[in-house]
């Protein structure tokens, strides 16, 4: 038996995308009974990355098997609800069900938006003061990004700075950004070029700063990415069709010599918490991007994740910690 309930939350500040600011995230809470146990999942389509809201809703209402490559958000929600039910029945956290070692927390990054170099330095300093050891800097894909990188890396010696171009730079600009990043010791540059430019990624990888891909995972498999020198893959479970599919991709990446970073897609609390459990299972040398709850206003349930000294606690409670089928009341 499965129940589906729509929800809408606000993003503050709005998420800047290629098509303009995204001020709200709309999705569906999925309740699914497996045997005697009920689990809760979340399907929150991301425009431009997954199926549309209406397609997701139709997929959840249908009785056909869901394809994670066609309706990834819907598949994520249904699969997660089943995983939570299975974990609760076994009285273990989802992280344990996914193969995580006995960990209680995972390292996470803070995120700093596109702004002036002075504002970047201030924001990075605030993140460091809050205990973060890794900060992700959003870039504009412009020559001025070099100044932003210099400002960010100049704040503290013992903090990892990574940067994300969202595929916005042209090749000459990306070359200057990546060359500067190599000199400044940047952890990695994420999606410096559009996903289609494999030759450009190969050129950038030769400059000395590790290259990560996000959007590129939707167009190329990890073997192809490894062949052009990509070092890190960024995995959004909602976009890739669920936690188990990300685990398979991460295993393939590890075999090819690539590291994996798990990030949320500014989802609501159920999917964010699940992403943290997945990050605990994936592990790896890099901080994960699952500490995005401070951006969500009017969330659908209390957030069980707490960031302390740059880490989020996953916890040992069954399922997703304090999130159960009673965490979200559609009639409230």
Where in this protein do the model-derived segments appear?
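N-terminal capping/lid subdomain adjacent to the active-site entrance of alpha/beta enzymes
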Residues: 1-161, 166-175, 179-183, 207, ...
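Conserved beta-strand termini and adjacent loop/short-helix elements that scaffold enzyme active sites
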Residues: 7, 111, 164, 214, ...
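Residue-level recognition of alpha-helix initiation/capping sites
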Residues: 118, 143, 172, 195-196, ...
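Catalytic beta/alpha-barrel core
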Residues: 113, 133-141, 160-167, 184-196, ...
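Flexible, glycine/charged-enriched surface loops at secondary-structure junctions
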Residues: 94-95, 188-192, 264-265
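Shared catalytic-loop signature of beta/alpha-barrel
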Residues: 58-59, 64-65, 199, 203, ...
């Amino acid at each position: 038996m499965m129940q589906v309930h729509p929800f809408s939350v606000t993003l503050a500040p709005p998420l800047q995308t290629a098509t303009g600011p995204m001020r709200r995230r709309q999705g569906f809470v999925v309740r699914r009974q497996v045997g005697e146990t009920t689990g809760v999942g979340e399907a929150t389509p991301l425009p431009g990355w997954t199926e549309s809201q209406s397609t997701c809703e139709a997929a959840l209402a249908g009785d056909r098997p869901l394809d994670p490559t066609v309706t990834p958000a819907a598949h994520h929600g249904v699969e997660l609800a089943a995983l939570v039910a299975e974990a609760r029945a076994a009285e273990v956290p989802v992280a344990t069900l996914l193969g995580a070692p006995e960990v209680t927390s995972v390292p996470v990054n803070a995120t700093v938006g596109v702004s002036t170099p002075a504002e970047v330095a201030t924001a990075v300093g605030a993140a460091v003061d809050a205990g973060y050891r890794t900060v992700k800097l959003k870039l504009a894909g412009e020559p001025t990004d070099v100044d932003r990188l210099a400002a960010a890396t100049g704040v503290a010696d013992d903090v990892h700075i990574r940067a994300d171009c969202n595929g916005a730079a042209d090749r000459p600009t990306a070359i200057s950004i990546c060359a500067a990043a190599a000199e400044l010791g940047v952890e990695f540059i994420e999606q410096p070029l559009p996903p289609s430019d494999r030759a450009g990624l190969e050129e950038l990888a030769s400059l000395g700063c590790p290259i990560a891909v996000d959007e590129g995972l939707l167009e190329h498999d990890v073997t192809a990415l490894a062949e052009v020198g990509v070092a890190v893959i960024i995995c959004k479970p909602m976009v890739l069709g669920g936690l188990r599919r990300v685990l398979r991709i991460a295993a393939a990446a590890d075999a090819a010599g690539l590291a994996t970073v798990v990030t949320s897609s500014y989802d609501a609390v159920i999917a964010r918490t699940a992403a943290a459990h997945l990050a605990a299972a994936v592990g790896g040398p890099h901080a994960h991007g699952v500490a995005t709850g401070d951006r969500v206003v009017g969330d659908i349930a209390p957030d069980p994740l707490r960031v302390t000294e740059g880490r989020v606690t996953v916890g040992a409670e069954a399922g997703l910690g304090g999130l159960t089928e009673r965490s979200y009341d559609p009639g409230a």
